[in-house]
From Swiss-Prot:
Coiled-coil ranges per UniProt: 534-708
Compositionally biased tracts (Basic and acidic residues): 40-51, 697-716
InterPro entries: c-SKI_SMAD4-bd_dom (IPR014890), DHD_Ski (IPR047315), DNA-bd_dom_put_sf (IPR009061), SAND-like_dom_sf (IPR010919), SKI/SNO/DAC (IPR003380), Ski_DNA-bd_sf (IPR037000), Tscrpt_reg_SKI_SnoN (IPR023216)
Any one GO molecular-function label of the UniProt entry: protein domain specific binding
Subcellular locations according to the entry: Nucleus
Residue list for modification Phosphoserine: S380, S429, S477
Protein name as catalogued: Ski oncogene
Reported function: May play a role in terminal differentiation of skeletal muscle cells but not in the determination of cells to the myogenic lineage. Functions as a repressor of TGF-beta signaling.
GO CC entries: centrosome; cytoplasm; nuclear body; nucleoplasm; nucleus; PML body; protein-containing complex; transcription regulator complex
Organism expressing this protein natively: Mus musculus (Mouse)
């Protein structure tokens, strides 16, 4: 019965086993890529299978008469050798989410495609590289093997609507942030070595800096290895030059030092994901301090420098990882596995799963000296034997698979050559063919935790592994919360453009009532195992269905039917999501066009107001100029009058005296003439008086002569009266 149970638990459909192995081999988060992880996993799997097969062939001791007859344990049927997986296809990321980044102090528009920023090349040429000719730029691109991709129609339309490109632009090139950093560094800061100087002086300065206790030897592995001397006291600002290159003896800021290199420029390497702002992850302590007393002190000093001016709090001190569980726990696990042959058989069947997770754990834990803590280490095909032999534990398996899932979700080919836009081709295929060819895609996010729920034969194992999980999670929480937060942020950027966002709902179809796969977990075992949730529960349902419900042809056909149904539902959900996304993009474009029109109107009104203000300002300036000229003229006249007054102040009294004397003389002459006229008039009056008196006298005489003499008679009296006057 026990052997039969073991044989039943070890049976899996070859096609499904191949699919699962292909997924796990393709989803490794390693700089070496799936090829290195696949080779390491296969060799470790073969080695452990050979060990267990040798242990199973050891002859049993001869039983005595008192002992019961031994039970013959037949070795379980070994699964077929792993088949090399084919290429892993992913839909191209055509993200149209525009954002901005800073390159050499200039703000550049870009699109986040597959987690890598693609910058607008014309904007870089017109701002950062405006002092260089196209011939120089093309020659440097050919030397560095930099190729630019062509933006899609949606991206080109967005750049036109936002005013970054003219509406007549037929196309636009996009360059990755990594290649843009390389290109700008080669053009702006290329030139390698300083002008020649006295060798004795340069050697003495370099030797003095190296022998100083205040300097730390560091290096980086970006675009070729480069060594330098870090002087922490010189790091007084984010852009302070505090690292001296040991090759050219020039000082560089940290974010420029990580791009600086002299020897192997790695021009034929496909670079991806570089950002000079993350220099804290690229600058490492020199290997010369390995095993020395000052290694810990200088490491803390380097961490202090990295924590300075870290306003975003992205850098956190690394906590050392424990590569193996405690010695007091391992014997219990070994005893438990030796007591339950069925559980050891299941562990052997999932060896490739643990081995691949262990390889991912190595890439994150960096416990091997050849795999140092480097965020930008070039891939090397040489894999040491110690790296292939792994003994991972459960907490690291869960954490690293989460990192693998998050990082693989946003993976995309980093660089493509500039080529004309390709047209999408629609190929109609039967549902079964779709399931076979695209099987890894719905499982991309379904097998996230890689935590296997134990069955009835291994009910005691969770009791031993749970304390290890708690202890390891406490130790790794500080070091891995940064990785998880970064990967969640990166995956959220491309969640709309990746079909994996529907995997959770599609994977839930495996637990539908149509499966009829009862769980094989005992109540006592379920009490000790934490209740899985989300993708972990879906993975357990899938594994239970594979282990317990696929022993007949009808069950297999039913399972395939459910998988086809799940695939159809996933395609429907994906189509609906893409349609909704397309509608939202159209609305967004409409809003952007309307906003652009309003912005254009506001710009026109602003331009008119500016013209009116300029006109009023010109008139005001003209009036002010005239007023100033008038003021200057009046001031000049006043100064002239004042100067004349000051100059003539001495002779003014004489001139006035002469003037007044002349006037007095004139008046005196006039007075004399008036006196003469007066005398003449007086004389004339006297003559007239005399003449009048003479005339009166003559008249009187005549009157007397003419007066008649008086007569005594009356008639004579009348005549006298008549003659009287």
């Amino acid at each position: 019965m026990e052997a039969a149970a073991a044989g039943r638990g070890g049976f899996q459909q070859p096609g499904l086993q191949k699919t699962l192995e292909q997924f796990h081999l393709s989803s490794m988060s390693s700089l070496g890529g799936p090829a290195v992880s696949r080779r390491a996993g296969q060799e470790a799997y073969k080695k452990e299978s050979a060990k267990e097969a040798g242990a199973a062939t050891v002859p049993a001791p001869v039983p005595t008469a008192a002992e019961p007859p031994p039970v013959l344990h037949l070795p379980a049927i070994q699964p077929p050798p792993p088949v090399l997986p084919g290429p892993f296809f992913m839909p191209s990321d055509r993200s149209t989410e525009r954002c901005e980044t800073v390159l050499e102090g200039e703000t550049i528009s870009c699109f986040v495609v597959g987690g890598e920023k693609r910058l607008c090349l014309p904007q870089i040429l017109n701002s950062v590289l405006r002092d260089f000719s196209l011939q120089q730029i093309n020659s440097v691109c050919d030397e560095l093997h930099i190729y630019c991709s062509r933006c899609t129609a949606d991206q080109l339309e967005i750049l036109k609507v936002m005013g970054i490109l003219p509406f007549s632009a037929p196309s636009c090139g996009l360059i990755t942030k990594t290649d843009a950093e390389r290109l700008c560094n080669a053009l702006l800061y290329g030139g390698a070595y300083p002008p020649p100087c006295k060798k004795e002086l340069a050697a003495s300065l370099a030797l003095g800096l190296e022998l100083s206790e205040r300097s730390v030897r560091v290096y980086h592995e970006c675009f070729g290895k480069c060594k330098g001397l870090l002087v922490p006291e010189l790091y007084s600002s984010p852009s302070a030059a505090c690292i001296q290159c040991l090759d050219c003896r020039l000082m560089y800021p940290p974010h420029k030092f990580v791009v600086h290199s002299h020897k192997a420029l790695e021009n034929r390497t496909c670079h991806w994901g570089f950002d000079s702002a993350n220099w804290r992850a690229y600058i490492l302590l020199s290997q010369d301090y390995t095993g020395k007393e000052e290694q810990a002190r200088l490491g803390r000093c380097l961490d202090d420098v990295k924590e300075k001016f870290d306003y975003a709090n992205k850098y956190k001190r690394r906590v050392p990882r424990v590569s193996e569980p405690p010695a007091s726990i391992r014997p219990k696990t070994d005893d438990t596995s030796s007591q339950s042959p069925a559980s050891s058989e299941k562990d052997k069947q999932s060896t490739w799963l643990r081995t691949l997770a262990g390889s991912s754990n190595k890439s994150l834990g960096c416990t091997h000296p050849r795999q140092r803590l480097s965020a930008f280490r070039p891939w090397s095909p040489a894999v040491s034997a110690s790296e292939k032999e792994t003994s991972p534990h459960l907490p690291a398996l869960i954490r690293d698979s989460f990192y693998s899932y998050k990082s693989f979700e946003t993976a995309v080919a980093p660089n493509v050559a500039l080529a004309p836009p390709t047209q999408q081709k629609v190929v109609n295929s039967p549902p079964c063919t779709t399931v076979v060819s695209r099987a890894p895609e719905p499982l991309t996010t379904c097998i996230q935790p890689r935590k296997r729920k134990l069955t009835l034969d291994t009910a005691g194992a969770p009791d031993m592994l749970t304390p290890v999980a708690a202890a390891e999670e406490d130790k790794d929480s500080e070091a891995e919360v940064e990785v998880e937060s970064r990967e969640e942020f990166t995956s959220s950027l491309s969640s709309l453009s990746s079909p994996s966002f529907t995997s959770s709902s599609s994977a839930k179809d495996l637990s539908s009532p149509g499966m009829h796969a009862p769980p094989v977990v005992a109540p006592d075992a379920a009490a000790h195992v934490d209740a899985p949730s989300g993708l972990e529960a879906e993975l357990e349902h899938l594994r239970q269905a594979l282990e317990g419900g696929l022993d007949t042809k009808e069950a297999k056909e039913k399972f395939l039917h459910e998988v086809v149904k799940m695939r159809v539902k996933q395609e429907e959900k994906l189509t609906a999501a893409l349609q909704a996304k397309r509608t939202l993009h159209q609305e967004l474009e409409f809003l952007r066009v309307a906003k652009k029109e309003k912005l254009r109107e506001a710009t026109e009104a602003k331009r008119n107001l500016r013209k009116e203000i300029e006109r009023l300002r010109a008139e005001n300036e003209k009036k002010m100029k005239e007023a100033n000229e008038s003021r200057v003229r009046l001031k000049r006249e006043l100064e002239q009058a004042r100067q004349v007054r000051v100059c003539d102040k001495g002779c003014e009294a004489g001139r006035l005296r002469a003037k007044y004397s002349a006037q007095v003389e004139d008046l005196q002459a006039k007075l004399q003439h008036a006196e003469a006229d007066r005398e003449q008039l007086r004389a004339d009056l006297l003559r007239e008086r005399e003449a009048r008196e003479h005339l009166e006298k003559v008249v009187r005489e005549l009157q007397e002569q003419l007066r008649p003499r008086p007569r005594p008679e009356h008639p004579g009296g009348e005549s006298n009266a008549e003659l009287g006057p």
